[in-house]
Amino acid sequence: MDVDSRWRNLPSGPSLKHLTDPSYAVPPEQQKAALQDLTRAHVDSFNYAVLEGLSHAVQAIPPFEFAFKDERISLTIVDAAISPPAVPKGTICKELNIYPAECRGRRSTYRGKLTADISWAVNGVPKGIIKQFLGXVPIMVKSKLCNLYNLPPQVLIEHHEEAEEMGGYFIINGIEKVIRMLIMPRRNFPIAMIRPKWKSRGLGYTQFGVSIHCVREEHSAVNMNLHYVENGTVMLNFIYRKELFFLPLGFALKALVSFSDYQIFQELIKGKEEDSFFKNSVSQMLRIVMEEGCHTQKQVLDYLGERFRVKLSLPDWYPNAEAAEFLFNQCICIHLKSNTDKFYLLCLMTRKLFALARGECMEDNPDSLVNQEVLTPGQLFLMFLKEKMENWLLSIKIALDKRAQKTNVSINNENLMKIFSMGTELTRPFEYLLATGNLRSKTGLGFMQDSGLCVVADKLNFIRYLSHFRCVHRGADFAKMRTTTVRKLLPESWGFLCPVHTPDGAPCGLLNHLTAVCEVVTKFVYTASIPALLCGLGVTPVDAAPCRPYSDCYPVLLDGVMVGWVDKELAPEVADTLRRFKVLRERRCSSLDGGGPDSHDRKAKPVPRAVPLHHSLQAGEACAEPGAGQRRARWNYGAALHEHCHLRGRGFWWSFHTPGALPSQPAEVIANFIPFSDHNQSPRNMYQCQMGKQTMGFPLLTYQDRSDNKLYRLQTPQSPLVRPCMYDHYDMDNYPIGTNAIVAVISYTGYDMEDAMIVNKASWERGFAHGSVYKSEFIDLSEKFKQGDDSLVFGVKPGDPRVMQKLDNDGLPFIGAKLEFGDPYYGYLNLNTGEGFVVYYKSKENCVVDNIKVCSNDTGSGKFKCVCVTVRVPRNPTIGDKFASRHGQKGILSRLWPAEDMPFTESGMMPDILFNPHGFPSRMTIGMLIESMAGKSAALHGLCHDATPFIFSEENSALEYFGEMLKAAGYNFYGTERLYSGISGMELEADIFIGVVYYQRLRHMVSDKFQVRTTGARDKVTNQPIGGRNVQGGIRFGEMERDALLAHGTSFLLHDRLFNCSDRSVAHVCVKCGSLLSPLLEKPPPSWSAMRNRKYNCTVCGRSDSIDTVSVPYVFRYFVAELAAMNIKVKLDVI
């Protein structure tokens, strides 16, 4: 669907009519497009990776060659394919296809088989192709390899999925995991940077450098830097298998092309013919190469190959020159296939580096979206897959060598098939990556981090679930930096990154979210025809000489390839022509359109848009119709080296719609759910984005099919009477997160200070904000018996008195049964011995058995050994539970006030919540006041008000609009009413502001956090009480508690809390030498009786009359022993 059409068909305003629609319970014919778009970047990138990208990756894997018994063996992966998830043949089942719900229920991984065609050759002679299973790799839900792909809602429901299932995640051991989108440096573009830490890389190194993030067609990435040295030379820095290497630039230039030194000199000084310092520096760099005796390209290659081949692990028969070429293919400008193109790019980077070092240009800002791109899940998946396939080839050599040590192995098809089956499968590395988020890689894949790549897509509520697919993270390494530069919100982020939705605290500014109208387009586009088009517009090819001097021309780049030069005076005209071609879709520029066969036939209006290429934003760009896969040419004026033009034609881009089309355009999806957010203080909107994700809501409709560790459910959710139009655009009424409450702003009691709130007890008894927690536990009897023993099954012995009629004959509790602490939970039998076992319910919290699922093994032949028990824990709001409005106004429930004592209006209505008016002045959440008036008028007139930001202004005031509606209903214009005291019955003198506000109950509940302990377990080392609620630990008595006792004048209580009740112990000490370690109990001779008293003797003094006992903390004794191990003596003065 076109970008424009998706945002033209927005709801004109919110409505409640679909809540009373007779066909409300009937699944629609198609899924909601708006919800599917939220995960499109994840799904499309994975589709590209496993289809087109996989073939590119296979072609990029070089043949693996090694010597075996004086023969040269070559293994090449010629093709690979991933199949949809299915059970093996011969499995006991009704259907071979595996669906995600089955993997969630069984806590297994949703994966498909990866098979490859391996070509093998001996001494260069091809011998055949073997099809080999390499392992099972995870499959993204709703991708083209998923069995749910393109299924309508009705069929999705039949397969136990949500009708609006969006996909975009993996299922690993039954847990939904999302690969984070990461912000990476802009690909294939030289970025000038100043880094003071670069001075520590070697003698003479400076802080000036030019960095480039080189990315191949299959997304393999390598970071490369040019460093400016104090003597005027340049060092080339690259990474190979996580090891840093430095190479003088002259060697790299000389090895890439067979140019003479004079030709290299002339290419480097283009545009700087009058700069004597630069010319001398170039001469010196070339002179360094000559001093090593390298005069030709062949000599340079031999020189580099001889020194680097020890790190490359190449066969012995590779000559040094080929080893050097292998190094350049893997590490130097890997996005370019031609060595000549690499040469021209290095020359351009060198000129840019000298311009930066001499102050002729500014450094590029790596924190700007201009110089950034997004790493999508499919890219990470493909990069990791390619590396593991290369590792598999290496494991075959290792397996072959091990086999040859034991037996005589000949190389033939049959033996190779056996050896291939001994290779390292890809199953466990992929599951480890997605389960932990930690990257185990020999090369590092060009990342700056190796952890935090994946997160759990927890369904605490629906908007929290959505946020996982819209977030982009800057990187874990940036969180450790002390500077705040990386966290700043720059102006060019407008329309791409949400200025509201970012966490407060450590990840602030690093974990951002895409705006609602921002898209990550993942289609790959080819650019082969663009250079010819540029030449027709007046661009001089790179190997030709322009009519004007090079200093009067701009270099032109296309995907990191220097394609030529353009006259400065002609450049604006060329740029305007390219933009016109893209806007009008003229036939001569049809190659710029990659949208499809009919893309050039569609009509498009010339609408300005910012369209960054490769996920990066370029200031001042204009483009029309940024559909999927379109080509775009970029002109970057005022850039570092020469104000050069930069054309980007392929890759991954962000696009957003016309500025001004939507009032909520710059905001993220969740930020768009905040009513009247333009009337609130900005930090309150940030808080609501976080608290909205902590709300106990209605995250899904298939509770009976889920086996999550913990799920929350709001029992009585409601549709808000006041909401933005985006709420209806995403059909959030299917997944509500709160309740409409009558809120009176009044200081009625003393229990509502510091944001606390009073709740009407009658409302509480009628189910206000009542919720439940669903907890699932897997019970696998195979973990309880020894290996080889298969005799345990669920069941109970007839007449077992321990069961107390609370377990069924199958040993499991009854559905709907109430469980209390100590009740029988489940039972199982040993079929060999006939012995019965009963396990009791250990939680202190009462619950109800909601459902029980019986699970089998992968082949369907498992016995009755594994079940999943889901219990429901009712959670009525209790004192201390946390609530919040949609405006960042959070507070705890401080008191359930009797309805008889609540204030009431003249119509007899009592509020559900009493809110302290002191919460408004400092927070400045005017949006909540407006919502109260709007909710009140909506309830009176039977309407649903639009709370989209910026629909009201000073000329069109929200107060007047809603005030007039209240006045028309017979109420006060300002939303106030006269209330009567519930205690005295007398009318209150002040007018009380009362209305309807949508309130959220947060997951932070006292029932999950309270701790009570008198005595209990202690730490084995320090002998202090252990901490932690799950292990019945104590509550930490910290510095603030200590200060509170001191302030109350009860300082001696500290002796009891911190000593007597902590780790008090009695120790023996030598008064004379002051040692705690030297007193030892004397060893009795065999003639002594067991009843005879023994004395403590000091091993240093040799006396027993100087031993005394003292009370000291046990941790002090441990500390003294640790110091003694470090040869440090502690001497005590005993008084």
Swiss-Prot record:
Region (Loop B): 194-208
Site (Active site gating): 687
Binding site for Zn(2+): 1070, 1073, 1098, 1101
Location relative to the cell: Nucleus, Nucleolus; Chromosome
GO BP terms, alphabetized: embryo implantation; neural crest formation; nucleologenesis; rRNA transcription
CDD domains registered for this protein in UniProt: RNA_pol_B_RPB2 (cd00653)
Family membership: Belongs to the RNA polymerase beta chain family.
Annotated segments matching region Disordered: 1-23
Full protein name: DNA-directed RNA polymerase I subunit RPA2
Annotated positions binding DNA nontemplate strand: 1020
Subunit structure, interactors included: Component of the RNA polymerase I (Pol I) complex consisting of 13 subunits: a ten-subunit catalytic core composed of POLR1A/RPA1, POLR1B/RPA2, POLR1C/RPAC1, POLR1D/RPAC2, POLR1H/RPA12, POLR2E/RPABC1, POLR2F/RPABC2, POLR2H/RPABC3, POLR2K/RPABC4 and POLR2L/RPABC5; a mobile stalk subunit POLR1F/RPA43 protruding from the core and additional subunits homologous to general transcription factors POLR1E/RPA49 and POLR1G/RPA34. Part of Pol I pre-initiation complex (PIC), in which Pol I core assembles with RRN3 and promoter-bound UTBF and SL1/TIF-IB complex.
Region (Fork loop 2): 474-489
Primary subcellular site in the record, as a coarse category: nucleus
Keywords: Chromosome, DNA-directed RNA polymerase, Magnesium, Metal-binding, Nucleotidyltransferase, Nucleus, Phosphoprotein, Transcription, Transferase, Zinc, Zinc-finger
Modified positions (Phosphoserine) in chain numbering: 1051
Free-text note regarding domains: The active site comprises the fork loops, the loops and the rudder that stabilize the transcription bubble and assist polymerase translocation.
Binding annotation for DNA template strand: 1036
Catalytic activity: RNA(n) + a ribonucleoside 5'-triphosphate = RNA(n+1) + diphosphate
InterPro entries: DNA-dir_RNA_pol_su2 (IPR015712), DNA-dir_RNAP_su2_dom (IPR007120), DNA-dir_RNAP_su2_hyb_sf (IPR037033), RNA_pol_bsu_CS (IPR007121), RNA_pol_bsu_protrusion (IPR007644), RNA_pol_Rpb2_2 (IPR007642), RNA_pol_Rpb2_2_sf (IPR037034), RNA_pol_Rpb2_3 (IPR007645)
